[in-house]
Amino acid sequence: MHIMEGYLPAIWCIVWFVVSIPVVAYGVYKLNKLVKEERGILPVLAVAGAFIFVLSSLKMPSVTGSCSHPTGTGIGAIIFGPAITAVLSTIVLIYQALFLAHGGLTTLGANVFSMGIVGPIVAYLIYKTGMKAKLNFYLIVFLAATLGDWATYIVTSTELALAFPAGDILTFGGFFSSFSKFVAIFAITQVPLAIVEGAVSALLFKYIIQAKSDLLVEMKVIGEPLVRKLRGLPA
């Protein structure tokens, strides 16, 4: 998913920076507010950030100028919301660009938009919808992480197709031709990777509920009755 350094035309680098900066700035505001109100959340914040870093570093060859890997943003989106997850993703993406030659600084805006903004938004919406529908909790986490991952790659395909349309982008034919090719190539690796990510995310959330369920209840991520049920405690 990480679009490599220098691959996008300058105009698209600027566009994605302009789109991403306000969301990340809002996320910084929310993160500062959260940490001031609840210092005990720092260990969970660290786990969410580490999960994003580890999973998104497991890259596989894919579309020219990009790669395939899990994103790890579903957990952060469920617990902290999309804005704070955008900040965590930005920190991870900057580190990977500087020290792992994974992604790039000029393409940072595009990578943040796909992995740090759209993916978490989709995961968050899936989680909220699933909770309202009273689905199995771990199934909700699985779906949120899986679909959030797929959304990231759909957006990355869109970014690449806009930058490199097969023909005149103004006719949209060139865009859709390129988009379909990028999506098809990504799907070979990303469909199974996202499913694995969903399963791992559900397992990690099970651990978090056992270790820090009080913070999740306090942040209104999950209600006390459901926590007791998931932990096998009497109602």
Swiss-Prot record:
Membrane topology: Multi-pass membrane protein
Pathway: Cofactor biosynthesis; adenosylcobalamin biosynthesis
GO cellular component terms given for this protein: ATP-binding cassette (ABC) transporter complex
Primary localization: membrane
Cellular localization per UniProt: Cell membrane
Transmembrane segment boundaries: 8-28, 40-60, 74-94, 107-127, 135-155, 160-180, 185-205
Keywords: Cell membrane, Cobalamin biosynthesis, Cobalt, Cobalt transport, Ion transport, Membrane, Transmembrane, Transmembrane helix, Transport
Annotated Gene3D superfamilies: 1.10.1760.20
One GO term of the biological process aspect: cobalamin biosynthetic process
Gene Ontology molecular function, alphabetical: cobalt ion transmembrane transporter activity
HAMAP family referenced in this protein's UniProt entry, alphabetically: CbiM
Subunit structure: Forms an energy-coupling factor (ECF) transporter complex composed of an ATP-binding protein (A component, CbiO), a transmembrane protein (T component, CbiQ) and 2 possible substrate-capture proteins (S components, CbiM and CbiN) of unknown stoichimetry.
Family stated for the protein in its record: Belongs to the CbiM family.
Function: Part of the energy-coupling factor (ECF) transporter complex CbiMNOQ involved in cobalt import.
Protein name (Swiss-Prot/TrEMBL): Putative cobalt transport protein CbiM 2
Organism of origin: Methanosarcina barkeri (strain Fusaro / DSM 804)
Gene: cbiM2
